[in-house]
């Protein structure tokens, strides 16, 4: 029997277990997550940033609250102008006016209970200077919280 035939049952079992892992109603499992953010400012890439985060059952049961921005800022008035949440996606857009004029848009895709990808775009003007940024984010569950 060849090595590839020996691995076939293991691969099938791994695939079955991956599908059989119960998903949270909103798409992600609580646990310890590695989040890699790759920013780009005014078209120039900056080094990726990696952080670890323990996501609680409360956070994963309300992905809208967990991944939506807080509309409160200092010296500006912000309004959520677009918002849509499904069990597998979240999109939103926020505009702010005042000392800082800003627009922030986020698009999250909860691919599996253990992985999500996102893009957050920001454009803001301060003292006549406009800055644009784009951050791509990949979150992967790595295990239970320490």
Q: Language-model features: where?
A:
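N-terminal signal peptide c-region/cleavage motif recognized by signal peptidases
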Residues: 20-22
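A short, structured loop/turn motif at beta-sheet edges
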Residues: 26-29, 57, 82-88, 107-116, ...
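Bacterial N-terminal signal peptides that target proteins for export
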Residues: 2-12
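Short, surface-exposed coil-to-beta transition loops
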Residues: 48-49, 100-106, 119-121, 131-136
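Predominantly extracellular/secreted and cell-surface proteins with exposed
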Residues: 56-100
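Short, solvent-exposed loop/hinge segments that bridge or flank secondary-structure elements
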Residues: 36-67
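Edge beta-strand at a domain terminus
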Residues: 124-146
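Short beta-strand segments that buttress and anchor functional surface loops
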Residues: 35-38, 91-97, 106, 119-124
